[in-house]
A protein has these predicted regions:
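Short, Lys/Arg-enriched, disordered terminal segments
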Residues: 1-2, 243
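ABC family nucleotide-binding domain
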Residues: 2-214
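Conserved beta-strand-loop-alpha-helix hinge in the C-terminal portion
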Residues: 218-242
C-alpha cells in the first residue's frame, strides 16, 4: 500500500500563527524505508503525528491507499491506527509490569486471534529479533537495545502498512543503535515493512533508501541511496548538511 502526503500544512494559534508545516508532499511507496531529518522546530514531529492520525492537518490530505486519513471519523481513525500502523519510540513505551513476551502478546490481543495463534506469532517475532531467550524477562532486566528490539517486534506484530519511528536510537549506545538499525533493515528487506523514521543522526539516516530534509516546515531536499553502499550515502548526507 502506497502512502501519499499531499500539500499537508499545519499551523498553531489563531492570533499569533505559527506554521509548523507548509505544503509538504511526498509518497511512501509500499516497502520503502524513508528517513526524515531537519533541525529542531522544522516540523518533523508534527508531520509524524499527522501521518499517525494523532494530530490533524490544517490543510492537505493523507492517503493510505484509497483511505483518506484527513476526513475519517475518530472511530474510523482509531480502527485504522490499530490495523495499519506500528510505532517505535525513543523511550520504548513497554509496560514495566509485563514481560517482553507479554508486551508483544498485548499488541496481538487487539486483533482477536486465538491464544495459540498469538503465542505462535509472538515466538516467531521474538526468534526473528533475537529476544526469544529473554521472553520471560521484564523490561528493567534487559538492555536498552533489547527493549527496542522488543518494541520493534511489537510494532510489526499485526503486519502494519507502515511503521513510524521517532528518534528510535536516541537513548541507545552506538553498538545497540547499530543492532537496532540492522533490525530495521531486516524488517524492511525481509519482511517488506514500510518504515518512516525521524532522526537527527546521520549514521541512522544512512540505513534508509531515501532521505527527506525538512526546514521551517518545508520539504527542501531529497536524497536517494539507489545502489550506493551505506558509507558512501552517509558521506553524501554529511556533504548536504555542511552546505
Amino acid at each position: 500500500m502506497d502512502i501519499k502526503i499531499l500539500n499537508v500544512g499545519k499551523q498553531y494559534g489563531s492570533v499569533h500563527i505559527t506554521k509548523a508545516l507548509d505544503s509538504v508532499s511526498f509518497t511512501v511507496k509500499n516497502g520503502e524505508f524513508i528517513a526524515i531529518m531537519g533541525p529542531s522546530g522544522s516540523g518533523k514531529t508534527s508531520l509524524l503525528n499527522i501521518i499517525a492520525a494523532i494530530d490533524t492537518a490544517s490543510e492537505g490530505n493523507v492517503f493510505f491507499g484509497d483511505f483518506e486519513l484527513t476526513k475519517a471519523s475518530a472511530a474510523k481513525l482509531a480502527e485504522f491506527r490499530k490495523n495499519n500502523l506500528g510505532f517505535v519510540f525513543q523511550n520504548y513505551n513497554l509496560l514495566d509490569t509485563l514481560t517482553l513476551e507479554e508486551n508483544i502478546l498485548l499488541a496481538l490481543s487487539l486483533n482477536k486471534q486465538s491464544k495459540k495463534e498469538m503465542l505462535e506469532r509472538a515466538k516467531e517475532l521474538q526468534e526473528s529479533f533475537g529476544i526469544y531467550g529473554l521472553r520471560n524477562k521484564y523490561p528493567h532486566e534487559v538492555s536498552g537495545g533489547e527493549k527496542q528490539r522488543c518494541a520493534c517486534a511489537r510494532a510489526i506484530s499485526n503486519n502494519p502498512a507502515l511503521v513510524l519511528a521517532d528518534e528510535p536510537t536516541g537513548a541507545l549506545d552506538s553498538h545497540s543503535a547499530q543492532i537496532l538499525l540492522e533490525t530495521f533493515q531486516k524488517m524492511n528487506t525481509e519482511m517488506h515493512t514500510s518504515i518512516l523514521m525521524v532522526t537527527h543522526d546521520v549514521f541512522s539516516a544512512s540505513y534508509a533508501e531515501r532521505l527527506l530534509f525538512l526546514k521551517d516546515g518545508k520539504l527542501v531536499k531529497e536524497l536517494f541511496r539507489h545502489d550506493k553502499d551505506r558509507k558512501t550515502f552517509m558521506s553524501e548526507i554529511y556533504d548536504e548538511l555542511s552546505i
